Amino acid sequence: MRIKGGKQTRVRRKKWLKQASGSFGTRHASYKVAKQTVIQAAKYAYRDRRNKKRDFRSLWILRLNAALREQGMTYSVFINLLKKHNIEINRKVLSELAIKEPSKFNLIVQKVKSEQPKAAKPAALGN
């Protein structure tokens, strides 16, 4: 007698159909299409978990640049001055400050603008 593995097949198919349960049309009802849908969704999720980091960094930089232009400064100049002053506040925190507490953000900008950066060691000359 041939054993076709009916229970295992049903369990496996139900697993794929359950994962595709939020999909529209035949995507949540047909086993073959549901499986393809779930696999493609996993690919998109994998890709976008990485893109999310890029997107948020771009958003923070965009917000900072907008807030800094109101102060008469650009993002690139500001970041350069922060590094010269050895101020280590990341872009996420600066962006949040610019939105939620503009007065404190303005203090940081004024401090960076007014003070001269700490002099780095001069480069050794050839002789």
Curated annotation (Swiss-Prot):
Keyword list, A-Z: Ribonucleoprotein, Ribosomal protein, RNA-binding, rRNA-binding
SUPFAM superfamilies, per the entry: Ribosomal protein L20 (SSF74731)
GO molecular function per UniProt: rRNA binding; structural constituent of ribosome
This protein's GO CC annotations: ribonucleoprotein complex; ribosome
Keyword RNA-binding (UniProt): yes
Biological processes annotated in GO: ribosomal large subunit assembly; translation
Domain of life of the organism encoding this protein: Bacteria
A Pfam family that the UniProt record links to this protein: Ribosomal_L20
InterPro entries: Ribosomal_bL20, RIBOSOMAL_L20_CS, Ribosomal_protein_bL20_C
Family: Belongs to the bacterial ribosomal protein bL20 family.
Function summary: Binds directly to 23S ribosomal RNA and is necessary for the in vitro assembly process of the 50S ribosomal subunit. It is not involved in the protein synthesizing functions of that subunit.
Identification of the protein by name: Large ribosomal subunit protein bL20
Organism of derivation: Mycoplasma pneumoniae (strain ATCC 29342 / M129 / Subtype 1)
Lineage: Bacteria, Bacillati, Mycoplasmatota, Mycoplasmoidales, Mycoplasmoidaceae
